[in-house]
Amino acid sequence: MKHILALDQGTTSSRSIVYNERLEVVASAQKEVTQHFPLPGRVEHDALEIWESVLSTAREAISKAGITASSIAAVGITNQRETVVVWDRKTGEPVHRAIVWQDRRTSEAMSAFREAGREQLVQHRTGLLLDPYFSASKLSWILQNIPDGQARAESGELAAGTIDSWLIWKLTGGSSHVTDVSNASRTMLMNIRTGNWDPDLLGLFNIPGSILPRISPTSGDLGTVDASHFGTAIPVRSAVGDQQSALFGQLCTRPGLVKCTYGTGCFLLAHTGTDAVASANRLLTTVAWQIGDQPLEYAVEGSVFMGGAAIQWLRDGLGIIKSAPEVNTLASGVPDSGGVYLVPAFTGLGAPYWDPDARGTILGLTRGSTSAHIARATLEGIAFQVADLVAAMEKDSGKKISVLRVDGGACASDLLMQIQSDLLGRTVERPVNIETTALGAAMLAGLGAGIWPDVDALSKIRSVDRRFEPTVTATNRRARLKTWKRAVKRARNWEA
């Protein structure tokens, strides 16, 4: 039997999963990665630690599976998006820590571009809004802040890319400097209609094109893993941004299907087919994937920066829980939040507000407020943000989203999913396999390796675990959403 090795490199950990041809998990391994916070608003990773965590978990997963690497037909990679790495081509060593998607250090530069009237050009070419979230300004910052960075980039001494590019470079022993269209579409440097790096955008951010990887289809030939890593050469047959991978893993492969991933952040994506639909409500237009030589497929996306990360803050910052799952027990101890509202804008607000100056806010506290109320308000704060995204997406499409497919670690919380259904007034549908990010990468790698002939052959893979239906009245829902809007207003422009 053939196997697929999925490498899932996320914001807080790296996971490797071995799947069989039926897409059943044979074995897996996971390792946390360290986030560094050198200054307020700055978030970094050690790119070598990321590489070592991926390599070690891959070896561990293969060993646990009791197979040899020769039975692995393909490697599929999925990764945290926007995070950017710059390294020396000769040594393969990073020249600076990776700047993470959550990092806000380039807020002022983005504001200056907006004031100069650049956002229309950027949005038309990339589908994105001028925000420090995306890779271009991070890459520009690195080149400007390392010794001779710009000169070294222009001379061809340096290479750059998102996490997929970095991992493929290391896996292939430096023989393949490549990214896929889904990751490239998040850099703010690729024209999403042509699928090529855009010369005007490279000029805007002062980034030499020679530093960037080749853009490849999501599913196809992205290089070959060097035999020194696993004892045999293995083809890399997919690379895909984590949210697009989850969209594929949920089999949202037809226009109109929608999913939300609850991870470090929350990400709502709706498949729009081969049409790059522009948003009038400050959502993003992004490439979903490209399978082989088929046309590019697109999605509309809303991004929330703080999802599961808000629960981590309860654990690591406030210390009111010892582990993330404890939030459910604590929050279940009260019937509601007691009028407490928590806006988890710790690193600003994403869609549809795009306010890097917003900050985390807790409102409605009284002497009767307890840690349980704060815990419940945190879960509600996550769900309120997703409700904002759904409302914006429905305005864009003019159509009601009747079912929201959910995945990601935090969706294992029945309480959070019930709160989400209540605040949406919609069915929330959770699959049996909630880790659809790695699954999507495995599916795309299998397609690239010819294990399955087409997407239709995968249609029977997905099965539903539970459907959550609303349990509150429309009046209750509207009142809570109205108060949430007031809370968001208080949190905005705090640092302005």
Regions flagged by a language model, labelled:
Residues 31-33, 217, 289, 470:
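Active-site donor-binding loop signature of nucleotide-sugar glycosyltransferases
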Residues 5-7, 107, 114-177, 183, ...:
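Active-site core segments that coordinate phosphate-bearing ligands/cofactors
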Residues 63-100, 129-135, 168-191, 216, ...:
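Short beta-strand-loop/turn "lid" adjacent to the catalytic site in phosphate-handling enzymes
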Residues 21, 69-73, 97, 209-214, ...:
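Short acidic capping loops at alpha-helix termini that bridge into adjacent secondary structure
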